[in-house]
Amino acid sequence: MILFFGMFSAQKNADLIITNAKIYTVNQSFDTAESMAVLNGKIIGVGKTADILKNFKSKNIQNLEGKTVFPGLIDAHCHFTGFATDKWKCQLWGTKSWDEIIARISDYAKTAPKEWIYGRGWDQNDWAIKEFPNKEKLDQLFPNRPVYLKRIDGHAAVANQKALDIAGITKDSKILGGEIELKDGKLTGMLVDNAMTLVEKYIPDIEDKMAIQYFSELQKECFSYGLTSLHDCGITEKTLGLLEKAQAQNSLQMKIFALMEDNPAYYDRWIKKGRYTNKNITVGGFKVYSDGALGSRGACLNHDYSDKKGWRGFLLSDRKHFENLAKRLKNSDLQMATHAIGDSANRTILQIYDEVLCGKNDRRWRIEHAQIIDKNDFDLFGKYSIIPSVQPTHATSDMYWAEDRLGKDRLKYAYAYEDLLKQNGWLPLGTDFPVEEISPLKTFYSAVARKDSKHFPANGFQKENALTREQAIRGMTIWAAKAAFQEKEIGSLEPGKSADFIIVDQDLMTVSEDQILDTKVLETFSNGKKVF
């Protein structure tokens, strides 16, 4: 195989030539090549080393001595800006008990310069006592300072009495699409989904210059994992402005496909404006939340939770809200990307999409997560051309307790990635970081092995829904690009596309399954320039 922009009688200049590599082009045929030439950030030739050196010349020739090259990896669902601006908060990821959290925030409170004590990352499912915390200890330690600690999934939080008072929350407060937890008629401090907004609007934003600094720092981490593009789900106009400012200052090189948050104040402006691109930043649609998360029992189910009788979760807005937005977006070139975890939420959004789009189409409207699907609803994705955008590490993070929530029968139809892939023949993959870790290698491993990082369980979790290695790589490259209408620019190593690629120390397509997570990204290139 050799692919050029035409055949040349004389050597053409290139900024960079890669030779003696094993290059997975991830083109339609999944061809491999040995060599690649790059000019002005674009790929101008791919083929055998001898042919590339015959047709191109460069002062920068990199002999990879057999190392493996993949297209730059794309995260099809994450919260880049949200995670970056969480950096000033108390980090609660990996905590194993409520006591450990109390210790962390007590230390943080001594050094934090802001009045609010704001933390994120706890998960009660990792504790010996798998129950939501309450505010009692927080009230004792911080009676005059507001405390707000968000769960790992971003769909629940515990607040102390000071924070509740600032927000005006009492035992009689109610909100659509959220839960203000009471026990014995008293506030516990637990807030789920929309109830969280009552407090969050009072928490001050970080300074713009700090946000831009954190974008740059998080970008470096993403590049180190081989990510060259990502889909940032649910950002504000202010955040978009900060991204563009960071890009203008040359502190942001990451390709970002942004989905705006579901804010009615944005509708007219963005529907009129349509799809928007500023260099590496593209706004392509709206991110909408239909329900909450399974871990905090906010996912909207068709039947009761197996571990909470009489409770089915809830939709975060009434059906009319989703219908009206879908109808408005139909007349634009913007995508609708709706978070749906529970089988009831997924069915609701599938039905609304069908009512608006009327069957087969190429609008590429998405359902983010598509986590629990009623067995009778899978074919609706294919019937209506709806794209499930999934995060394989959710399966291996939730597998320890998901059966408690769903029972054996429903669990069979959860995290069913192979079944979902069959519907349209392609499936974009992401991480949902910071809910999960940034590493796309863990996405790959979870998708193909259905195991956690300790290689548990031995036979894989519901292995019948594992993806092949080729499917997983496509999901992290060309299919992720396709989910954003960017497959002509990025996602594979072909002439005319951006020279976004990574060099790794072992071949993910052939290395033994238990060695996948040992793979190291050696170098990352974006637009032909080395960024890691």
Placement of each model-derived feature along the sequence:
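Bacterial Sec-dependent N-terminal signal peptides
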Residues: 1-13
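Divalent metal-binding segments
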Residues: 13-19, 24, 28-269, 284, ...
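Short, glycine-/Ser/Thr-/acidic-enriched flexible segments
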Residues: 23, 43, 67, 124, ...
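Active-site-proximal glycine-rich helix-loop-beta segment
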Residues: 77, 385, 500
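Extended low-complexity acidic/polar segments
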Residues: 144, 278, 308, 380-397
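Acidic (Asp/Glu)-rich catalytic clusters
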Residues: 247-250, 273-281, 358-360, 381-385
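His/Asp/Glu-enriched, well-ordered alpha-helical/loop segment
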Residues: 327-337, 344-365, 369-370, 375-379, ...
